[in-house]
Amino acid sequence: MDKVTDNSPDVESTESTEGSFPTVGVDTGDTITATLATGTENVGGGGGAFGGASESSAAIHATAKWSTAQLKKHQAEQAARAAAAEAALAKAKSQRDALTQRLKDIVNDALRANAARSPSVTDLAHANNMAMQAEAERLRLAKAEQKAREEAEAAEKALREAERQRDEIARQQAETAHLLAMAEAAEAEKNRQDSLDEEHRAVEVAEKKLAEAKAELAKAESDVQSKQAIVSRVAGELENAQKSVDVKVTGFPGWRDVQKKLERQLQDKKNEYSSVTNALNSAVSIRDAKKTDVQNAEIKLKEAKDALEKSQVKDSVDTMVGFYQYITEQYGEKYSRIAQDLAEKAKGSKFSSVDEALAAFEKYKNVLDKKISKVDRDAIFNALESVNYDELSKNLTKISKSLKITSRVSFLYDVGSDFKNAIETGNWRPLFVTLEKSAVDVGVAKIVALMFSFIVGVPLGFWGIAIVTGIVSSYIGDDELNKLNELLGI
């Protein structure tokens, strides 16, 4: 009898290690292996180092306390793991497809072998030997088919595991992105809070507490209304139960039992009415307490706002005191008195038309031009060229408060630009038109606030200040211009 040799290709299968990336590799030749590449440790989740069903609550709480920098680093690491998982998934699909095709090929070989088995003269002569060879071939093919099927099923399982791990990484990435967004929002709010002074923070806290108190009051009010409806319903039911007891129908068998049942129902309804009434009274007490909380919160908010206003008034007063002191130190006490006089007269004053103010200023400027050299003019232009509008806006806000007006910071840039162009070209009308637009609501005080902001925030020099005060004076009257002329010796 011929020796039967199993020539089926060797098919190796390496068991999956929990917590690893599933990968595949189809070797050259007839050997096909299914392997697992070790994944990154401690990624999160249960069921393995790489991650199972979900991250533990402790890990999530710990991650929630990370800074934005830590979360961003963690996010980058997760992105790398996600890329590795996608690569592993692609390899697993390739492995599954290769092994599935291998199974199909083996099955087809078996089918062809069975189909080709027809008796011949030689086969009949060696029937016993051929039967044994045929059985050996059948067993070999059956064994190879079973082995290929098991490997194909293992590859399919590895593919499912790779997909699960990919989805788990995606879930973890979404969680990290959510935590990062919350951390960034918290940091932004902290930075905003840190930029506020104590009085502003007190107002914010009081506003928040008032909003919370109002929300609690609304909730309590809703509870009272709900319980009032219940009391109203039970009161109607109690009235009907009382009527049923009061109407006594006798003379039929068992009427006493019916009467007792009605009396029990009446007592039950009385007990229920007492219970819901007590609940309503309790809800009303809570509602009234919440009303008191709202009133107290409103008082606290008013106190905080009053403290803020006092602080702002003090700040604005300090600003103006510092402003006049600066003018005194730089240009003398007389100049400081003129500035104070301009500020005082500007309060509540209505301004002249652009043409009137410009005509008054031109007379003053024509004389002033003879005093200002090109070097002085260039210095004023350069100072206006390098204005820090952030600092200028702070000065405007403080000066405006001291004059009890509000000013739009956006006008500062327009005034600065027109002022600079006027120094360069000698055309002052655009500046006066801009000043008129800015002051249309509150009058000359707005012009004073705008122009005084430039005195504080821009190193204009003596002649630059003379121009600024001349512009302001032209809106107030000839008396102020005459004082300036006398002071400047023109």
UniProtKB/Swiss-Prot annotation:
Bias regions of kind Polar residues — which residues? 1-20
Keywords (alphabetical) are: Antibiotic, Antimicrobial, Bacteriocin, Host membrane, Membrane, Plasmid, Transmembrane, Transmembrane helix
Q: Where is the composition biased (Basic and acidic residues)?
A: 146-170
Q: Any idea which GO molecular function terms this record carries? A: pore-forming activity
- A biological process term (GO) from this entry: killing of cells of another organism
Where do the segments described as Disordered lie?
1-29, 146-171
Q: Where in the cell is it found?
A: Host membrane
Give the matching InterPro entries: Channel_colicin_C (IPR000293), Channel_colicin_C_sf (IPR038283)
- What Gene3D superfamilies does the record point to? Colicin, Helix Hairpins
Give me the Gene Ontology terms describing cellular component.
host cell membrane; membrane
Kindly list the residue ranges recorded as spanning the membrane: 447-467
Superkingdom of source: Bacteria
Function text = This colicin is a channel-forming colicin. This class of transmembrane toxins depolarize the cytoplasmic membrane, leading to dissipation of cellular energy. Colicins are polypeptide toxins produced by and active against E.coli and closely related bacteria.
UniProt similarity note: Belongs to the channel forming colicin family.
Q: What is this protein called?
A: Colicin-5
**Organism for this UniProt entry:** Escherichia coli
